[in-house]
Structure formats: structure tokens, C-alpha cells
Amino acid sequence: MITIKKGLDLPIAGKPAQVIHSGNAVNQVAILGEEYVGMRPSMKVREGDVVKKGQVLFEDKKNPGVIFTAPASGTITAINRGEKRVLQSVVINVEGDEKITFAKYSTEQLNTLSSEQVKQNLIESGLWTALRTRPFSKVPSIESEASSLFVNAMDTNPLAADPSVVLKEYSQDFTNGLTVLSRLFPSKPLHLCKAGDSNIPTTDLENLQIHDFTGVHPAGLVGTHIHFIDPVGIQKTVWHINYQDVIAVGKLFTTGELYSERVISLAGPQVKEPRLVRTIIGVNLSQLTQNELSAGKNRVISGSVLCGQIAKDSHDYLGRYALQVSVIAEGNEKEFFGWIMPQANKYSVTRTVLGHFSKKLFNFTTSENGGERAMVPIGSYERVMPLDILPTLLLRDLIVGDTDGAQELGCLELDEEDLALCSFVCPGKYEYGSILRQVLDKIEKEG
């Protein structure tokens, strides 16, 4: 077992009851284009087209053969684009239940599948996009191979769903999915990472390796798992997938149908009844959260409060890789002498307010409690960074754009979520996730 001691479990109010409920009825879903790093779409549909579940919507020009399929049947009502015609979202009004079917197999056949059979079904169904690479966090090329494949079956993000609760209901589909993924690269390790005290279903596979992690966040991040088990570099790539997509893989291969359901956490200080809800990928979050939130100005986030995406306008949908929806209040009000008050109701990792010594949960808002300033190395980053890197030096190189120095200090192992805690504790209010992405893009472009 690997124990993570450095990190932070955010004491935020609104933790979800770990019981699955049905979510609000919705009639709109979307695929968010900007979730896919470096993707340039070649559209196969236009506004007004009627599509079936599993039908191709667009293909990646930069990654030929990688297709993106509809999570539900209905009518294309909008194709939203931003600056430089960047694809923001493809919106579908859900109608009917027509679907495209794919190859299916009996449970006994799964362990005899060839790598090509697995790859073909994943690509044709669009489930290939559930896989991501490290480094760079991109959908892998269909011609590439990985050093190993990671399945993340734990989640230590604030307000997250407990994977064991979800997997209890889908244990057979999950083990079927593991069997299928083990056939993708039969000679390469399949790493299943789980919490040490969790009851995660497993199966006896030749290349399956099970790893237990325990401790504070980010113990549940795949970047942490990769760092300790099979570190990557410029010449070495691993792939990873989350546990709910493994369920979808299992269902695809045994039913021949694309499975787009999600069980997500709907939680946060502004949610009236924080709980787990059953919905679908790409769901309209305004519809999902209708009558669920406390009065006032709220920020709905697709993903974790630490590193999720703001859900509004053309991005008002559940992300492809998001397993939670977090809601906090907009904190734009000014406080009289806020800088000098004892602040018993505020939390601080640097012990600058009385709230640090309290054991209660806090109603966090979007307020940053200060403006941008110079980076101040006071040891905050080291307290929340469990990886074997020098965070202050790495973050400095990221800020100034020193790609050589950043590579030497381990930036290729990281994704935006791995630096979310550094952003949270940063006295200078830097958003290190977006800075990291700029540096990674530059490294990939320049080689």
C-alpha cells in the first residue's frame, strides 16, 4: 500500500450522501470540444440533422481515425464555436431512442479477444476517447501503444462520489471492462488503482496488477498513481481511464450498445440535497440543477471545485471526464476591514485566520481573498505536493516559460488537476493548471 501524507482534504460543506438517486429529467446533452486537448474537428453533421445514439458527430483532423459519437439520439440544435472557430460544443435535443449497434460478445469470449477486435470496437463506438495519454493528456492515436494502462477506481477530490458505491451496482460490467482492456495490450501491465479500504470488484487476469493507495488528496489522482508505479517521460507514454468508462466498455462489448450513463456527485455548499445522481454524459447542467440550488448567485462547476470547468452558456454541460458537479456561491462581495478581522468562518492553510483551528466544514465561495501578486515561496506548495519533485522551482519555471527547466523538474508527469492544490494554496493567486497547459503545448510543438 502506498500512503500519501502530503496534500490536503479540503474541509468544504455540502458533502454528498453516498446513495444513488435519479437526477432531474433532461432533454439536452452536448459534447464539449475544448475538453479534448489539441483536437481539431472535421464535422460529419450540421445543425438540424437527426442523429442516433452512437452516430459519428465529428472526427479529429490531427488524430485521424479518432471519432466522437452522439451520447443520445435526437436533433442537432447548435454547433457552438469560439474565437478562431474553436469548437465549443455540439448540442443535441434528446428525442427518441434510436441507436447504432456494434459488435458484441459473450462473457466467455471476452478473454479471447484480439487486440485488434478490442481496438476496432472502441474506435467505432467512440469509446476510444475515454482513453487519455500521459504526458499531454490527449486522446491517444489509434496507431500508438502504451507502456501500461491505468484504471483509476478511487476519487479523493472534494465532494466526490465513492467509487465502491457505484461499482457495487455495476460489478459485473466493471470486471467485464477490465477483461476487455487487458486484451488491448496483453503483454503490458493493466494497473488497477483503488483506495486501501475500498471494496472494488476485481477479476483474475494475467496482466492485472492491483495497487492500494491511502491518505489525503491527491492520493486519488491518476497522476499520483502513475508517478509512483510507472513514471512517464518524453519517450515513454502510459494511458489511463476512469472506472465509470470501464463500466461503459464492459457494457459495450456484452450488449453491442454505447452506454452513456453516469453516476455523479451533485454537491457543494449551495446544493440543497447533496447526493449521487444518475444522469448521462454531456447533460445540460442548468436542467440537472433546476430547483436543486440555494437562492443567490451560484457558480456551477463541471468537475471538482479545485480544477473543474465553469458551466455556463455554450459550456453549460457535464464534461466527458467529469464525475461530479460542484456548486459554490459567487464570492464577489467586499468585506469591511476583511484583512484585519479574525475570520473565524474562513479557512486558511497558512494559519492566518482563526478558522484554520476549527474542525468544522466551511461554505467556500469563489472569492480568492486578494489579487494577483508575485509568487511567494513560503513552503505552501511543499505541504500539498506528494510527488518526488521540487514544486517551488517547477512552478517558477512554468511561470517564466522555461520548458527545458520544467521538463527536468518533472512537468511531463503532470496534468492540470495535479497542480490544483498548488493553485489553491498559492499566496500569489496563480492558476498553475492553465500555465502548465501552455508549457506542455509548447513542449509538444517544439519537440
Curated annotation (Swiss-Prot):
It comes from the Bacteria. InterPro entries: NqrA (IPR008703), NQRA_2nd (IPR056148), NqrA_C_domain (IPR022615), NQRA_N (IPR056147). The keyword ATP-binding does not apply. One of its GO terms (biological process) is sodium ion transport. The keyword Ion transport applies. GO terms for molecular function: oxidoreductase activity, acting on NAD(P)H, quinone or similar compound as acceptor. Keywords: Ion transport, NAD, Sodium, Sodium transport, Translocase, Transport, Ubiquinone. It catalyses: a ubiquinone + n Na(+)(in) + NADH + H(+) = a ubiquinol + n Na(+)(out) + NAD(+). Disulfide bonds: none annotated. Composed of six subunits; NqrA, NqrB, NqrC, NqrD, NqrE and NqrF. NQR complex catalyzes the reduction of ubiquinone-1 to ubiquinol by two successive reactions, coupled with the transport of Na(+) ions from the cytoplasm to the periplasm. NqrA to NqrE are probably involved in the second step, the conversion of ubisemiquinone to ubiquinol. HAMAP family: NqrA. This is Na(+)-translocating NADH-quinone reductase subunit A. It comes from Haemophilus influenzae (strain PittEE). The gene is nqrA.
